[in-house]
Amino acid sequence: KLGFRCDFGSTSFASVRRAIMLTINRNEFAQTFTGGYGSVVHGPYYEGSAAYKAVKDTIKLNAYTYSVQSAIDELVDGGWIYNEKGEKFDAAKDTVRYKKLSGYELSSDNLKFKSTDGKYSVIKLDGEYYMPLVVNWYGTQPNDVTNQLVTAWQTAKAAKDIGMYITYTSTEFNPGIYGELYRMEENGYDGTPKLNAINFATGFNSAVYDFAFSWTLNQNLYNDYNSAHLMDEADFYEKYTK
């Protein structure tokens, strides 16, 4: 799966996460990766599981059907409508979209957000801060999924068409997951948040389908168990520092 760190940077915005999924052709990806023997599911389950069978006739899941235009619509609705000059984004001449930050979005981590190659960063224009549509992706290696994501997502035309810039950093499992995603210094984290996305697997290691720990907001459990570091606005605002 492609997982996101959702408490800073571009991937803290749901519009960006949805746009990413709309510009990855998931059916094509699954067919290519499995040699035609795989199929797409829309969450951490498999169709033979009891949890899925119990709700398969009533559950409604977003299939994120591949659509560049739908991705653009998500970004526009989410406020990614500016260029690096603070003017209206023009796809004919501008490369990367920007979003004007306000309120709790003006966190310390957000204001320092930049691409890992240093090409793009948050800019200040006339007292306003604008964030670039940059996604810093870490890909574990050796990993065939990582290799396929490079062509199916990072360097794909669709990413450029929506005004998104994606950096790729090759990483081993421990430095990527525990160092950059979970920010553990003993695994190489240097104190500066960088990672927005990383690909890794979902394991089915329990007969009980319970993902409560994966989305906990309990501050005693959050850092170790919340897989996406996804807070609601109230939680984020408590940590707000300008």
Which residues make up each language-model segment?
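Short helices/loops that flank or line small-molecule/ion binding pockets
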Residues: S15, T151-D161, P175-L195
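Append "and occasionally in soluble cytosolic enzymes with long acidic Gly/Pro-rich linkers
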Residues: S12-A158, K242
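Extracytoplasmic/secreted cell-surface and envelope-processing proteins
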Residues: L2, F13, V145-N147, Y178, ...
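Beta-sheet entry/capping signal
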Residues: K1, R18, V134-N136, Y165-T167, ...
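Ligand-binding clamshell of periplasmic/extracellular solute-binding protein-like
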Residues: E172-F173, G191-W215
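A local structural motif
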Residues: Y130-N136, A156-I177
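Extracytoplasmic/peripheral linker and loop segments enriched in polar/acidic and small residues
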Residues: A30, I166-I177, Y209-K242
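Extracellular/periplasmic solute-recognition and catalytic clefts
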Residues: K1-D7, N27, Q31-G36, V40, ...
